[in-house]
Amino acid sequence: MFRDSAKIYVKAGNGGNGMVSFHREKYIAAGGPDGGDGGKGGDVIFVVDEGLNTLIDFRYKKNFKAEPGQDGGTSNRSGKNGEDLIIKVPLGTVVKDELTDMVLVDLIKPGQTCVIAKGGRGGKGNQHFATPTRQVPNFAKSGDLGEEYSLILEMKMIADVGLVGYPNVGKSTILSMVSAAKPKIANYHFTTLVPNLGVVQIEHGKSFVIADIPGLIEGAHEGVGLGHQFLRHVERTKLLVHVVDVSGVEGRDAVEDFDTINSELQKYNQVLSTRPQIVAANKMDIPGAEENYKAFKEELEKRGYKVFGISAATNKGLKELLYAVSETLKTLPDTILLDETQNEEVVYKVQEEKPFEIHIEDGVYVIEGKWLRKVLGSTNITNYESLQYFQRALKKKGVITALEEMGIQEGDTVRIYDTEFDYTR
């Protein structure tokens, strides 16, 4: 089964907690703090595996969690770091944040790796909190939480050439005749429901990869006829071979078919309207096709297109078509065209968040902020010294000032995620 999209959840490992301990040794009455640091949580890492060609594995496993770091030990011993979790994905996988729909990474290189979720830092042991005035720190920091995301994976095939056109115009037959690929072929619409890849060998060792894109229809850019799923794969190709049925047996006009498909490509992604095209007028073996072909070729050559009359069923004209494709590919950049505007460097940036937000809910001051979750997670709220450390962090970030400007009073309740505090000056 082919699968070109999936939704998964990833969670990096939490950092291990710092240790609270004091040096104990015979004849040493006042051993200092020697609590070790917690280990770092494991990262979640995507790795491109060229042996994969579908996202089907993510149909059965959707939740991925890396190993947490171990807690620190006595005698300044640090906890062991958690192991990274490696997730293998096919070449051409696009990773999106489900919440924002923002592209996080586009995996287009063999062996490419990407840390998609970073493990939490290990908490500091109490050895780090000794000062001249606090020689016996009775607290340590908890480990930071590992990053977690709900992700959308989309696979976009990578090929040199894409065969596009209406359903049942002969794209799969062409692929089967020019390569070793064995796509499903039948005389009805949407026989091909998944993209198929084939390698075309030209003499003297020259070759290129060609993809049979399932048939497109009017409204494909809006998802009609599974259009979104099919058009996704066209974006990766450097050259399009636009296959048109000139036999007239379907009762459609060949020029109108050509214009309709190009309109759908343009509406889906403006970049596709500028993608080079070679036109293959197929089914020339059917009576009446020759006359239709002459008018069709004349019109498209006026527009500057190269047009080849072929019959995929009899092999007529395929050799000439393939040589034209091979020669055209030589003139095109040897790079993968991405989803974004051509000739423009794509930089993915995480949206900047406000340091914190405060709102009042049923008389309770609710404070939210990504860094707050981390700081609170690393605080031992049952320890007075650790709480003091947390309060200083809030004051430094301006949270206390913001609360006072909102009119908070002594004894009012403050909630930070799942933890509530009474406000005191």
UniProtKB/Swiss-Prot annotation:
Molecular function via GO = GTP binding; GTPase activity; magnesium ion binding
Q: List positions binding Mg(2+).
A: 172, 192
Q: Where is the OBG-type G domain?
A: 159-330
Q: Where in the cell is it found?
A: Cytoplasm
The protein's predominant localisation is: cytoplasm
Q: What is its EC number?
A: 3.6.5.-
UniProt xrefs under Gene3D superfamilies: GTP-binding protein OBG, C-terminal domain, GTP1/OBG domain, P-loop containing nucleotide triphosphate hydrolases
Cross-referenced InterPro entries: G_OBG (IPR031167), GTP-bd (IPR006073), GTP-bd_Obg/CgtA (IPR014100), GTP-bd_prot_GTP1/OBG_C_sf (IPR036346), GTP1-OBG_CS (IPR006074), GTP1_OBG_dom (IPR006169), GTP1_OBG_dom_sf (IPR036726), OBG_GTPase (IPR045086)
Residues noted as binding GTP in the record, renumbered to the chain:
165-172, 190-194, 212-215, 282-285, 311-313
Q: Which UniProt keywords apply?
A: Cytoplasm, GTP-binding, Hydrolase, Magnesium, Metal-binding, Nucleotide-binding
Its needed co-factors are: Mg(2+)
Give start and end of each OCT domain: 348-425
> Which Pfam family is one of those matched by this entry?
DUF1967
GO BP: any one term: ribosome biogenesis
CC per GO annotation: cytoplasm
**Residue limits of the Obg domain?**
1-158
Report quaternary structure and partners. Monomer.
Q: Which HAMAP family match?
A: GTPase_Obg
Q: What does this protein do?
A: An essential GTPase which binds GTP, GDP and possibly (p)ppGpp with moderate affinity, with high nucleotide exchange rates and a fairly low GTP hydrolysis rate. Plays a role in control of the cell cycle, stress response, ribosome biogenesis and in those bacteria that undergo differentiation, in morphogenesis control.
Q: Which family does it belong to?
A: Belongs to the TRAFAC class OBG-HflX-like GTPase superfamily. OBG GTPase family.
What is the protein name given in its UniProt record?
Answer: GTPase Obg
Q: Which gene encodes it?
A: obg
